[in-house]
Amino acid sequence: MIPKFRAWDCSSLILMYSPLEVIFGDSDIWIFDEDSEGNEWIVNNNLSLMQSTGLTDKNGNEIFEGDVVKMAKNVYSEPTYYEVVRHRGGAYRLESKQYGCELWLRHTDCEIAGNIYENPELLDVE
């Protein structure tokens, strides 16, 4: 599987979606800018990269690290918001202040509600 990325540009506060080609230099991040007139490689060190988990939510939307998803812990509980994070060992997890689980176990139960950059307020609702 070829890794897919999206990026949050910390300078312009814009989320850049795939297809996003990325090259990691010694101290630089190069991205291929298809939106520019010359379709050129540009250096942007103000990026926060988010890799695709390779999984989709219950609506078929691709889940990236940094997404905020909504999911009920069980059939009796109200939906809660969770951040998608990469944990030690490389596994993707759903994390909230009170609960966490492996993403691969519950990805078909969750729905993408936003991301940590554009919707940080979702994670404060607990």
Language model segments and positions:
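Secondary-structure transition motif
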Residues: 1-126
